[in-house]
Amino acid sequence: MEWNGRVDGYDEDILRIHQVIQVKNLDELMENDYTGKKVCFVSYNSNEGIRRNNGRLGAADGWKHLKTALSNFPIFDTDIKFYDLKDPVDVKAGKLEEAQQELAEVVAKLKSKDYFVVCMGGGHDIAYGTYNGILSYAKTQTKDPKVGIISFDAHFDMREYNKGANSGTMFYQIADDCKREGIKFDYNVIGIQRFSNTKRLFDRAKSFGVTYYLAEDILKLSDLNIKPILERNDYIHLTICTDVFHITCAPGVSAPQTFGIWPNQAIGLLNTIAKTKKNLTLEVAEISPRYDYDDRTSRLIANLIYQVILKHFDCEIN
């Protein structure tokens, strides 16, 4: 997919993302010797996890619409270099697990070259690949990797996976992996919907020590809830499942929420996370363009992505 959009000219102060982004294959990205601030978008082309989870399909096209929405955003800091992995990680012939492994390898490689990696789905099964990529890279840096997951989501995504992985099993898989390897499972979820998770899922989350906040309690949260997560971990996996937001803001999702949170309720928390000096990876999932109106869901998430990028690189817009 090509990046394109409005062109006001070519002076630095009127440039937009589509005018500066460099689309490269993985080998070219790994050969890049730029050591400054750099972002790499990685696309994950998958409906398979949602199909297995009996959800409504369409998220495989989410990343395309995100790129369209991101394309026209103005450049505020020319020191930030934008890159896009040319080919999406693609689920072929229903082989979800192979795609997750490929994604993990891509993420680990890009992180080894100090890219701020932004993964764009696709279904939320993207999270298993992203997390394992972060962990794989972290293991090359320390014998005691501390990876904290902060998820904005209406669901725990800790369903059984004895019949295979899907878009609702990732964090149970990660929990089991961590237990087996003796790694702390530090999973924190914001926006949980009381009626979108069974009692078993609540019980399972509690048994694994998951910290969660109901959507109805979002206004009670502050930096005080977020900063301890950032302080005790060296790597932060920030994952946003778009169905956390209210249906009027995010109609184009796999599982729309009539009592979802509002973007302005999340932005302060996201800013706190984005400003961390810890090693941050961002991931977004579950945009289903076929159910969207005027691309409002893609526009919302694109705005949040860019906000996180700019905040992470200390770019203030006056």
Swiss-Prot record:
Binding annotation for Mn(2+) 1: H124, D153, D157, C241
Keyword Kinase belongs to the record: no
GO terms under biological process: L-histidine catabolic process to glutamate and formamide; L-histidine catabolic process to glutamate and formate; putrescine biosynthetic process from arginine, via agmatine
PROSITE patterns per the UniProt record, alphabetical: ARGINASE_2 (PS51409)
Pathway listed: Amino-acid degradation; L-histidine degradation into L-glutamate; L-glutamate from N-formimidoyl-L-glutamate (hydrolase route): step 1/1
Keyword set, alphabetical order: Histidine metabolism, Hydrolase, Manganese, Metal-binding
A GO MF label: manganese ion binding
Keyword Nucleus: no
EC number, as in UniProt: 3.5.3.8
Free-text comment on the cofactor: Binds 2 manganese ions per subunit.
Cofactors: Mn(2+)
Record field: catalytic activity: N-formimidoyl-L-glutamate + H2O = formamide + L-glutamate
Domain of life: Bacteria
Binding positions (Mn(2+) 2): D153, H155, C241, D243
InterPro entries listed in its UniProt record: HutG, Ureohydrolase, Ureohydrolase_dom_sf
Major enzyme class: hydrolase
PANTHER family named among the record's database cross-references: ARGINASE/AGMATINASE, FORMIMIDOYLGLUTAMASE
Function: Catalyzes the conversion of N-formimidoyl-L-glutamate to L-glutamate and formamide.
Family that this chain belongs to: Belongs to the arginase family.
Protein name per its UniProtKB record: Formimidoylglutamase
